[in-house]
């Protein structure tokens, strides 16, 4: 399914889009969005070396943590839609802040982003909403985790709660590896098995 003018029928203007992020996800979004005939310019901040190779795209520097500067730049660039790619600004409530400033934003608010940034909250949400999900335990100490590991059978999955840049999930082949994985991430946050 492509992005065409019908995809954006609720927008009175769609000249300038800002995409926040610097990864392949953001470049893919920029590539798809720039194909729409309504879009004149796609700004990426910070973008990456490949961003400017995409038609209609320009990398710009905006400190998204400096809210005053961000709002000023968005107004100056006459941005019609902001797309937030990375999880961290979503988890920190950037989409909520921008919506309160009357900007159109594609990306969940802080509460919606919690499904991504908190593994324990997401699992509890699925359980409470009767959404099928694997059995899980939430532990608060390494000793508690080891006890569950010893009483369980492999395969087990060990997950750090919170954002871990894609590095917080382990699928060990043995209980010993499971304990090592648990030890390696336990100081970062709560772990889930």
Predicted segments with their positions:
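ATP-binding N-terminal substructure of ATP-dependent carboxylate-amine bond-forming enzymes
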Residues: 1-111
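Generic secondary-structure signature for well-ordered alpha-helical cores
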Residues: 35-38, 75, 103, 127-131, ...
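Short acidic-hydrophobic, aromatic-tinged amphipathic segments that line or gate anion-handling sites
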Residues: 59-65, 137-141, 172
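Conserved small/polar residues in nucleotide/adenosyl-binding loops
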Residues: 82, 191-193
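Short, glycine/charge-rich beta-strand/loop segments that flank catalytic centers
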Residues: 84-91, 108-117, 137-145, 163-166
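Glycine/small-residue-rich loop that forms an oxyanion/phosphate-binding "nest" at active or ligand-binding sites
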Residues: 99-109, 116, 122-129
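Glycine-rich phosphate-binding loop of ATP-grasp-fold ATP-dependent ligases
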Residues: 133-138, 156-185
């Amino acid at each position: 399914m492509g992005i065409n003018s019908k995809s954006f029928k609720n927008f009175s203007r769609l000249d300038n889009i800002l995409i926040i992020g610097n990864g392949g996800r953001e470049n893919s979004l920029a590539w798809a969005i720039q194909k729409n005939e309504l879009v004149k310019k796609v700004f990426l901040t910070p973008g990456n070396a490949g961003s400017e190779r995409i038609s209609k795209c320009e990398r710009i520097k905006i400190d998204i943590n400096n809210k005053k500067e961000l709002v000023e730049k968005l107004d100056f660039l006459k941005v019609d839609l902001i797309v937030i790619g990375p999880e961290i600004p979503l988890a920190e409530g950037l989409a909520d802040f921008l919506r309160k400033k009357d900007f159109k934003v594609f990306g969940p608010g802080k509460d919606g982003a919690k499904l991504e940034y908190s593994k324990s909250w997401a699992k509890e949400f699925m359980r409470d909403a009767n959404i099928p999900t694997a059995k899980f335990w939430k532990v608060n100490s390494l000793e508690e985790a080891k006890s569950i590991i010893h009483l369980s059978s492999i395969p087990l999955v060990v997950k750090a709660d919170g954002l871990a840049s894609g590095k917080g999930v382990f699928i060990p082949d043995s209980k010993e590896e499971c304990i090592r994985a648990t030890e390696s991430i336990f100081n970062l946050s709560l772990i889930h098995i």
